Curated annotation (Swiss-Prot):
Source organism: Deinococcus geothermalis (strain DSM 11300 / CIP 105573 / AG-3a)
UniProt GO molecular function: structural constituent of ribosome
Keyword Ribosomal protein assigned: yes
InterPro entries: Ribosomal_bL17 (IPR000456), Ribosomal_bL17_CS (IPR047859), Ribosomal_bL17_sf (IPR036373)
Protein name (record): Large ribosomal subunit protein bL17
């Protein structure tokens, strides 16, 4: 039984899931929106929201916690200086997931995840 086992495996091992989450979070925070599968978007949402909430702390410790997951210095700078202040008054709910149809090759549901 898998009681209490949150999260999805996404048909990957642990390190590949971490790499996927970091890469997609970096792309989302850099571009503001990305298109991916619905399942990956649902896994990405809490990861990015926790990063933004951490960045709202605004101090050096918060910057280092963000840099631990986002390995692009420009994106870390953008999160700390632009994204976090934008959501200073907002208590969560920084992202939106929109379904955009199915992928032609395998019929999987695609989604657009964007910063609100």
């Amino acid at each position: 039984m898998r009681h209490g086992k949150a999260g999805r495996k996404l048909n990957r091992n642990s390190s590949a899931r971490v790499a996927l989450a970091r890469a997609q979070a970096t792309a989302l925070l850099r571009e503001g929106r990305i298109q991916t599968t619905l399942t990956k978007a649902k896994e990405l949402r809490p990861y990015v929201e926790k990063l933004i909430t951490t960045a709202k702390g605004g101090d050096l410790h918060a910057r280092r916690l963000i840099a631990r997951d986002i390995h692009d210095k420009d994106v870390v700078r953008k999160v700390m200086n632009e994204v976090a202040p934008r959501y200073a008054e907002r208590q969560g709910g920084y992202t939106r997931i929109l379904r955009v149809g199915t992928r032609r090759g395998d019929g999987v549901t695609m989604a657009l995840i964007e910063l609100v």
